[in-house]
């Protein structure tokens, strides 16, 4: 089974934060999860709120566990709130259904994991995360 290496996870984090600085975003927090939803790498920039790890992880966790992007999860939550409520019941409240959760795929389309970015608007979080994933030579789906 293909996976995100620790080196690639660190690259994703580093390049996501660099993109955030380039875009002049608020301080970001970034987590990279493997295909089982386990953290591989996390960083919280100076000035980011201490609770941002759980938000970043929740964005990524929903993506990897359901095979959906953060945008798709948001849309599903708006259309069928009962679905996301049920999912959060099943996953102990760990799913945050908003953009900034990004599926990570290899070139064959296999899901390798997910990235969660938080700190600015959800759309800006997603843009920064996509840049980090691309810099690691992987494919992001926000």
Task: Label each residue range with its predicted role.
Residues 1-142:
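Flexible, solvent-exposed loop/hinge segments and secondary-structure transition points
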């Amino acid at each position: 089974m293909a996976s995100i290496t620790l080196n690639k996870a660190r690259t994703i984090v580093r390049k996501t934060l660099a993109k955030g600085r380039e875009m002049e975003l608020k301080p970001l927090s970034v987590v990279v999860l493997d295909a089982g939803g386990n953290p591989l790498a996390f960083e919280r920039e100076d000035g980011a709120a201490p609770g941002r790890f759980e938000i970043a992880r929740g964005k990524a966790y929903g993506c990897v566990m359901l095979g959906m992007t953060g945008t798709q999860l948001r849309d599903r939550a708006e259309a069928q709130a009962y679905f996301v409520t049920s999912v959060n019941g099943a996953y102990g409240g760990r799913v945050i259904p908003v953009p900034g959760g990004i599926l990570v795929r290899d070139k064959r389309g296999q899901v390798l994991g997910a990235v969660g970015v938080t700190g600015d608007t959800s759309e800006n979080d997603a843009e920064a995360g996509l840049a980090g994933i691309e810099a690691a030579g992987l494919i992001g789906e926000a």
